[in-house]
Amino acid sequence: MKALDKQNVAQALSVVPGVVLQKSGSRNEEQVKVRGFDSRQVPVYFDGVPIYVPYDGNLDLARILTNNLGAVEVSKGYSSLLQGPNQMGGAINITTQKPTKPLEANLGYRQGWSRSRDNAYDMHASFAASSDLGYLQVSGSQLKQDFLGLPHGVNNDIAGKHGKMINSSADDKRGIVKLGFTPRENDEYTLTYIKQDGEKDNPPYSGNSGQKSRYWQWPEYDKESFYYQGTTQLNERFTLKSRLYRDTFENTLMMYNSLADLKNKKGSYSHYSDYSDGAGLQLAADVRENDLLSFAVNWKDDVHREKGAPHAAYDRYEDRTWSLASEYQWAAADNVDVVAGISYDWRDSVEAKKHENDGSITHYDDNNQSAFNWQVMGKYHFANEDTLALSYYDRTRFPTLKERYTTSKPAYNQIAIVNPQLKPERARGGRFNLEWCLHARLGI
């Protein structure tokens, strides 16, 4: 990511084969599609912890900076069901760095210019220390943009003046604290805290389609995550992995639908206050010399709260999701590996409450859904580092809270119908994958 100068996760993912960057105009979001599957169908994980937004499954990946990250991985065909539910189209996993030396430190700063003016800067710093008993890593980063530059010759009230695009600022800050304890060679226990504070504006459309320009701002796009992860080798055959987490999301939107509204700060208001609690256990057993049998149980509670005025009461929606999964990795021959996985997922509606304009409260009926998933992959290893893999999957994802409960009026005067009993979406597909190394630094 650093070598390619990718400043956020969306940009980093855009260079992965089969991944397409998708920019949203109305919400000024950067998301990706993985072989045609969108963010609702491809969950995003941070060190294996799901961080996608509970309400609609979306997440603005441009808000996640790449400084001090270890890697960003995309699972397209075969995606381990041990991670949890809703992996219909695969999964994206972002991993944080771990120190590799007794003492490490890093400091960086970059300045950006547009139209002969400084318009942005990027800075980051990190410190880490490690020993045989564990490690500590602290890092922080900020990417701030005051404005986007306008082309020469563009100077009007809608787009902006003096080379500055109106309503185009952004400010993203992130801090990470990671504490690890390694009492034995194969045991590791980590506590991680991540705080992300984001602000962004959405520049107006200034084309000729007749579309009305609007000036939306997000003074708050904040995520906070705290999680524990443990790996314990119980004996020579069994290994237990454990996970416990809380992830929160605070999102405030100010909707100014004209330049006059923007100047007078007169517009509509929307606020989300969401959180997710979850836990997981994974037990792995060495069945034969090179075979591995794993079992996993995952639990996740998603709570979405929203209101349309600063002093209004919250609408509240809560789902509880469970997943039981198993996976077997079989070394069929010296150069042939086979891996297969199954899972059974179920989701229960705990609460769905909406405050109506007339002061009444609507309580939607409880609802629940379940789904079975399975997949298999075979991989052949050639004499060199080339591999040939063939996989087939049958996976699902549960409808989001937005898909089941939204009553917002869509465009073109359509009517939204509440559908709490909406069933899981399912995808079946196969993948043929050849990794062919043409040269030490070149492959297909």
Model feature map: region roles:
Residues 10-49, 70:
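Extracytoplasmic beta-strand/coil segments of soluble accessory domains associated
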Residues 13, 71-74, 92-94:
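Non-catalytic regulatory/gating segments with a bias toward low-complexity or hydrophobic composition
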Residues 21, 49-77:
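Short acidic/polar hinge/loop motifs at secondary-structure boundaries
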Residues 100-116, 122-219:
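Periplasmic-side early beta-strands and strand-to-turn transitions of outer-membrane beta-barrels
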Residues 103, 133-136, 185-189, 236-240, ...:
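Repeated loop/turn-to-beta-strand initiation elements of outer-membrane beta-barrel proteins
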Residues 109-113, 131-133, 142-146, 195-199, ...:
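Transmembrane beta-strands of outer-membrane beta-barrel pores
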Residues 199, 250, 303, 346-358, ...:
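Surface-exposed extracellular loop regions of Gram-negative outer-membrane beta-barrel proteins
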